[in-house]
A protein has these predicted regions:
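Conserved, mostly hydrophobic/aromatic
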Residues: 7, 106, 156
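Flexible glycine/acidic-rich beta-alpha junction loops that bind and position SAM and/or redox cofactors
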Residues: 14-19, 74-97, 120-133, 159, ...
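Short, small/polar residue-rich loop motifs at catalytic or cofactor-binding pockets
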Residues: 143-146
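Short, basic/aromatic recognition patches
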Residues: 131-141
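Radical SAM enzyme core and accessory elements
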Residues: 117, 155-157, 166-169, 195-255
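Radical SAM/AdoMet-radical enzyme domain recognition
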Residues: 1-80
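C-terminal accessory region of radical SAM enzymes
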Residues: 97-132, 163-204, 210
Length: 255
């Protein structure tokens, strides 16, 4: 009761099994599905956390077919980031073009399903609708501002965000440092704020985006100084999302 579980499940199955293997080298897709179905049968709430690699982003239709077939109620696609200290994973890194192409295709499929009353909840779409309807930012980085999350490792080491769990960004240790000091640590604020790319200064979405999450700059947003994947996605999706937000406001407005 009052517990939300996260299920790490990459889509489609070939993408999951290529990178999520057990100690014997076997893919784990089937085992994760078994665990997810156990949660469903028990009536326990869960979200699916799906890593958006370059391979997954190239297959938006296959990803959405899997979402439908598995009857996933809530899903969050997390961009596969370029490595801070793990170059062996660079080959799976998402690109801004891949981000935009994937989300535009998934948005069309999601909107079509929504018109028929059967759309899965996609976190990015939900977050944008909430932002447009209320002005409230519910996701760290969505408006370009970092909010310390204080990730705590088993040895007590504290980091400002799960995207920055490396020695360079270690804020301190929960066993020895006061919580307020950890929240004020430079790595939890100033170090995560990068200067905005020059393309942002003339972008019509600047007030909505604020430059976005600095850690996702090269995967979701900028390629050089001439293209932004997030702006490309918003060009297509924002009119529909704005309409949904307006309809939601009308429905919730007191008589």
């Amino acid at each position: 009761r009052n517990l939300l579980m996260g299920i790490s499940l990459d889509l489609p199955s070939t993408v999951h099994d290529a990178v999520r293997r057990d100690a014997a080298g076997a893919g784990t897709y089937g085992r994760v599905l078994h665990a997810m179905n156990l949660l469903k049968r028990r009536g326990l709430a869960f979200n699916v956390l799906s890593t958006l690699t370059s391979e997954a982003a190239a297959q938006p239709q296959a990803v959405w077919r899997a979402v439908r077939a598995l009857e996933i109620p809530y899903i969050q696609f997390t961009p596969c980031l370029g490595p801070l200290d793990a170059p062996e994973y660079a080959r799976h890194r998402l690109s801004p073009e891949g981000f935009a192409a994937f989300y535009k295709a998934v948005f069309r499929l999601w909107a079509s399903d929504a018109c028929n009353g059967g759309a899965c909840s996609v976190k990015l779409f939900d977050d944008l609708i909430d932002l447009l309807a209320t002005g409230r930012t519910v996701a760290c980085g969505l408006d370009g501002r970092c909010r310390p999350q204080l990730v705590v490792e088993a040895d007590g080491s504290v980091y400002p965000c799960d995207f920055y769990c490396t020695d360079d960004f270690r804020s301190g240790n929960i066993l020895t440092d006061p919580l307020d000091a950890l929240l004020r640590a430079p790595s939890a604020a100033e170090r995560l704020h990068a200067a905005l790319p020059s393309l942002c200064s003339s972008c019509s979405y600047r007030r909505l985006c604020g430059g976005g999450c600095p850690r996702m700059l090269g995967e979701m947003y900028m390629r050089g100084d001439s293209y932004c994947g997030y702006a490309d996605f918003l060009d297509e999706a924002l009119p529909t999302l704005t309409g949904i937000a307006a309809a939601l406001c009308r429905r919730l407005r007191p008589c």
